[in-house]
Amino acid sequence: KFSGSVRCNDCELRVSSYGSAQAPVDCRNNCQVTVGSYAKFSNDIKASVLTLKISSGASVSSTLISDALTLSVDSYAKFSGAVTVNSRQAKLTVSSGGSFNGTFSGNSLEAEVGSYGKINLKGSAQVASAAVRVSSGAVFSAPELRVADYDLTVSNYAKADVWCSGTLRINASTAARITYDGPCRVESLTDNIR
């Protein structure tokens, strides 16, 4: 178990094998955090460029603040908290039963949900663009997030729920379920989109 604080220019932090860390991390440049094997991490992480990997039943409860973010959650791991990406793109990847449940604020979002993963984005922040791919059995839910332009790809037996004000481009399989709201213009509307 580690409790304290971490300050660095560049850092790499690993928590694994049922370990736990409750330390705020403040990193000026590149920060890589890996949490795996049923480990737990809780506290704020601030970094210019942040890479966070959560896997194998691990859990992270945190507020993430960065200029650029790459976040992956897989193998029944969980993330909960808040994400703010100030200038560049946020990349979220959730798969193999992993889950992301939190607020998002940023200009640009790229998300991929696969293998029964779930992304639940809360909050009503203004987002210029989002590209989202939802694979079979996965769920992407962001009904309050105010996204201008969406590029949405949804596979069979996957679900997506979004709000869009500009252009909503959809590539959906026949057994996909998509619901949307907002004053958007929909491209490639099919009968499984509501």
Map each language-model feature to its residues.
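Extended, compositionally simple hydrophobic/Ser/Thr-rich segments
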Residues: 1-194
